[in-house]
Amino acid sequence: MSWHPQYRSSKFRHVYGKPASKENCYDSVPITRSVHDNHFCAVNPHFIAVVTECAGGGAFLVIPLHQTGKLDPHYPKVCGHRGNVLDIKWNPFNDFEIASCSEDATIKIWNIPKQLLTRNLTTYRKELIGHARRVGLVEWHPTTANILFSAGYDYKVMVWNLDTKDSVIAGPVKTINCHQDVILSMSFNTNGSLLATTCKDRKIRIVDPRLGIVLQEASYKGHRANKVLFLGSLKKLLSTGTSRWNNRQMALWDQENLSVPLTEEDLDGSSGVLFPFFDSDTSMLYIVGKGDGNIRYYEVSMEKPHLTYLTEYRSYNPQKGIGIMPKRGLDVSSCEIFRFYKLITTKSLIEPVSMIVPRRSESYQEDIYPPTAAAQPSLTAHEWLSGMNRGPIMMSLRPGSELLDSQTLPPERPLSNSMVQVSPQPLEPMKQPAEDGDQAPFSLLEEKLAKWTAEHHLGEKSCLTNGFDVFECSPPKTENELLQMFYRQQEEIRRLRELLIQREVQTKQLELEIKNLRMALGQL
């Protein structure tokens, strides 16, 4: 076991886990008894989906997020697979579309109605047929619409293009055939240009998902990898598995060199799989153990020692699977930075656990909520398949704010209600470079900035405080006058703070629009 320093300066040093109360949990949920090492749970701001037991085939439940408490024993299921469901994933760009894979060697795409299900949903939108054996994993592309990856027990990863009217897709657009055994996990980097996998041969591979060639391969004997995860834009990988002495272990890798890990850490001697989760906004890493109730969390940095242990959430209720809420579904008013949904089979319970940063102020905490990935794709399927790469579109989590990184792309689907609204007066999309040195888009921004400055009278100076001229009035003579002036100044300070926050957000939006235009000009 590695030694952890007792103190470290970090704004996340005192993050703690807060389990939901009994009435805010999901009770009497028939959770699957499958022995596969998958999450079995998928969450978005509208629904929680969980794989369940079903006679005569595979099924999963889709429960509205607000419908907590005891579940009706006859609650409708999503069923249509002929074998057990092994994995489910929500479309990151459509909160009402979910993919499922099964032992029947098929993948199905489902449209979930916005209203509450009243009977079993058996009609799927698309069926993907191509694997020769059962399909164990599905993964949506992180920035591209309608691109889905699947991994089967035929040792193949298949790339599917769903941008078609066909209800049955009889073959993938690409098959990655570089594994010698069953694929255990898949993970994309930030822009989806690289795919990392772990295999039953305990090797980590970094694959070009379009060409299907192996770019890097780890054959380090001291670490038998089970799960792998890209760590955002840090150009690092995190894998969990076992050491030579069968201790549960995690290892950090440089994605450019997988010969030897940057660091290794033995955790304990339990046998359950370790599920890693990374929050690229806060650079926090969470390690969740299957079969125990603990959640360890670390802070990741570019400098040594790279991984800094923070603390651990402990619980007596062991989790069989785990789901996580996307950042856009968190409660920013309570300084929530991550949320887990633990599947507790011993109690037929789904328990939300919120990771909270303790803050005294109730205002929006800008430092712990940087811009995060929005529910809008930055590429179409055709663009990605033709070789384009682009990072995710960003949004602010501040209530009532706009998309910060709005690319000039046609929207693939309407935004969900939980997402922030786009400004009613966006910049005009650029179809070709301007003739006068490509300066036309910047002139639009200059006009917009000038108009905004004029509307807010930034060039004027005022000495009035709530109609009270501080330079013309004599100093207060009585205690009552002093109190009146004090309260007026307090109210003015509060109003100015709110105005300053609004202007900072608007300034950041304008800066990001300029950045986006420059990037777009560079691609033309």
UniProtKB/Swiss-Prot annotation:
Coiled coil: 484-523
Keywords: Actin-binding, Coiled coil, Repeat, WD repeat
GO MF annotations, alphabetized: actin binding
ATP-binding recorded as keyword: no
Per-repeat ranges for WD: 80-120, 130-170, 178-217, 220-263, 269-308
Segments of skewed composition (Polar residues): 404-424
TM ranges: none
Ranges where the record places region Disordered: 403-436
Listed GO CC annotations: brush border; transcription repressor complex
Pfam family, one: WD40_4
Family: Belongs to the WD repeat coronin family.
PANTHER family registered for this protein in UniProt: CORONIN, CORONIN-2A
Subunit structure, interactors included: Binds actin. Component of the N-Cor repressor complex, at least composed of NCOR1, NCOR2, HDAC3, TBL1X, TBL1R, CORO2A and GPS2.
The protein's name: Coronin-2A
Gene: Coro2a
